[in-house]
Amino acid sequence: MSKRNMNEDDRLEDFAVGQITLGGVTKTVYVAGSGPAVIVMTEMPGISPQVARFSRWVRDAGFTVYMPSLFGRDGAVPSAEEGAAVFQKACVSAEFRALAANQSSPVTQWLRALARLAHQQCGGQGVGAIGMCFTGNFALTMMLEPAMLAPVLSQPTLPLNDPAGLEVSPGELAAVRGRLDREDLTVLGYRFEGDRFCTAQRFAAYSEALGDRFVGRVLLDSAANTQTAPFFSRYVACPHSVLTAHLIDDAGEPTIAARDEILSFFKLRLGSSTSPP
């Protein structure tokens, strides 16, 4: 895949875009590729060029990418002010539980239905999903959908006001843990060591709740890209976005190693259109 300018809006011209209605709720979804389905959930403040780049990496690894528009301006490099406005709107949206621990965001119901639909459309063993930042925990809740097999949590940030809190109801968390044990599945998690939004306390809470079913990876702060878009420079003043804004797109970088581990995880659980027979 040729490198694009991450400082320019991404036209997303290589994705098929459509409206998908599930449970009476309609959202725009960008789809590309072939093979088993992987749902990529954007970080705040929306589908940036870096989020789209990650989706293309997943596509090129042999998967069908489903990238739902959950907030923000699709493909944009937003100003700090625009990004802050998107963040504030999402915090009070009925779809998200930004401040409350022990609750699951209502939008995860729609995302679980999307996983079920994607499995029907793409076939294969099941579906993978990755959430980032504001959506970071969503892939865990999506494990309540039987089609989901490969959840990845990248810098899960919610709830915002409880560093050790988990954005999932206790009953759903217990159900997910039971499924992980029964089916011998795991959850991958990623954060930077000095991330103030996704803390060590949160990863400790995941480990306590999920045991060795949670595989947490912590990257050194020195592995983070320091050249970021205005929103991140102003409002995210620490290493945070492992696979997008703070990823360094050079061979041998720890963030690239994290990307490759995730792609291998998807192939292990789902197979791919590039897997040998």
Region spans (language model):
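N-terminal cap/leader regions of alpha/beta-hydrolase-fold enzymes
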Residues: 1-277
